[in-house]
Amino acid sequence: MKAVDVLISGRVQKVGYRAFTRKNALLLGIKGYVENMPDGKVHAVLEGDDHQIDKLLELLRQGPVVSQVRDIKVTEIERAGHQGFEVR
């Protein structure tokens, strides 16, 4: 099990990116949250199995059809024991 802090930049707000993240996180059994940032980026904290996290990160690099992901920064962090997956 691991936890990562993820910062996604590009055209990622007002394109369904948070809903896309939540849907795929729930399908993969990942806990945490996703939120819009004031600077136009999307921030997520993901907790789960290494393989599941890697799979979700692959999906986040693609994003929903109308998004344009420019960059993803991933930092490993300590797990906080999130319950479920929340859109903030």
UniProtKB/Swiss-Prot annotation:
User: Which reactions are catalysed by this chain?
Assistant: an acyl phosphate + H2O = a carboxylate + phosphate + H(+)
Show the GO MF annotations.
Answer: acylphosphatase activity
Q: Would I find Hydrolase among this entry's keywords?
A: yes
Please state the Enzyme Commission number of this protein: 3.6.1.7
Q: What is this protein called?
A: Acylphosphatase
Organism (species)? Methanocella arvoryzae (strain DSM 22066 / NBRC 105507 / MRE50)
Keywords, sorted A to Z: Hydrolase
Stated family: Belongs to the acylphosphatase family.
Q: Which InterPro entries match?
A: Acylphosphatase, Acylphosphatase-like_dom, Acylphosphatase-like_dom_sf
According to the entry, every stretch annotated as the Acylphosphatase-like domain falls at: 3-88
The UniProt entry annotates the active site at R18, N36
